[in-house]
Amino acid sequence: MRIFVFVLSLLGLLVGCNRSNPTYEAFFLDTSAREDFALSDIVESVDVLFLNETDDVLVGKVSDVRYANNRWCLLDVDEGRSVVSVFDKEGNALGQLNRQGRGPKEYLEIASFDVCPKTGDIYLGCYPPKVMVFDKELNLKREIECEAPYMGIAKCDDGLMLYGFVARDSVGVDYMKLGSGEEVSVERVKSWRREKNATETIGKNTFMRSAENIYFYTQNSDSLYLANDGNLSVVAAIDYPNREQVRAYRRTHSIYDLPPMERKEYFVPRVHYAMERGGGLWLHYSNVLFGYGVVAKEGVKNYSSKCLDATSLCGNRLVNIVEAFHYDPENFDPNGWLQGVKVNHIKLNDKQRESGNKVLIIYNLRD
């Protein structure tokens, strides 16, 4: 078993709404030395929401989720389909953003999306390269042509943080400042040489919202960043055995050219989501949740545990999506992995269960 050692810049993570950069204290942590924790340490309750889909708002394969202004926005990108479906907090369909086409005010594919927590405006990073902005009624407000496609997008206070191809063999983060009217300026924040087998997925945002903060992670880098208007600050720098050799190999070779048993020697950690709770940082990868620098009664501790599978982190919620016929209350054992967590089940009738509609499993995080 490979051991991953994380060099973390932690503590002082409780950032206020002013988004000022916190002060970090760096220290080493070894994930082989840890204590298990109960999920109730970070999850307060679980809600279950049945989505009342309609003929005009059908949900397919959801790749990302946002929650803002009492609305659920689901990005659905799969096999040529590229739409955003919107539901209210009770699960009633409000509309679907579908402008696929080759003409003006249309897109071929949505690469990533975000929703402004304050206004509810929807921001799309699209192909061909452009950013499209819609209000919460799904009316087009703005269309901004770009030089390259962006696979990640996050709405900050005064602009957009954007991740995508910045050169033939490079990826990077740009900051797009949105001025009054049609005024736009773009500046490069950071870039990396792109690996041959980097696996950023279309429709899965590389930016993660946790409470008031935005985090950024790409497999082309071994760092987790705190992102705000025009800045990336390292929160966790990841180290692991033979890192330099692994990175050198991945820059020029594809691990998929190797026999399956040899590929594991060239795997790197992939962070699926990050969140601050209990005075520390929680990172999720490989279906394991690691808590670093978490303040406990006994002092600062490091934890890990097998964790729930979540599609997205939405502020102070982790969200998973299942089809209605897969929702089974018996899977939420109050005496097992969810001990100490209040689960608010719903009862589905036969018609709902057989509908194929989606159900949101919402894990509400503790403050």
How would you describe each model-predicted region?
Residues S20-L51:
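Blade/loop signatures of beta-propeller domains
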Residues D47-S82:
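Beta-strand-rich domains and repeat architectures in extracellular enzymes and scaffolds
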Residues N52-D56, N92-T119:
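Blade-loop segments of beta-propeller domains
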Residues K61-D64, L108-F113, A148-K155, A198-N205, ...:
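Repeated scaffold domains used in trafficking and secretory/extracellular systems
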Residues E109, G125-D169, S185-E195:
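Asp-box/WD-like beta-propeller blade repeats and closely related beta-sheet repeat scaffolds
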Residues D55, N98-E106, E145-M151, V189-E195, ...:
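Short coil/turn segments at the loop-to-beta-strand junctions that recur within blades
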Residues L14-G16:
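C-terminal motif of bacterial Sec signal peptides marking the signal peptidase cleavage site
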Residues A236-P259, F290-E323, Y327-D328:
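Conserved blade-ending motifs and adjacent loop-strand segments that build the rim/top face
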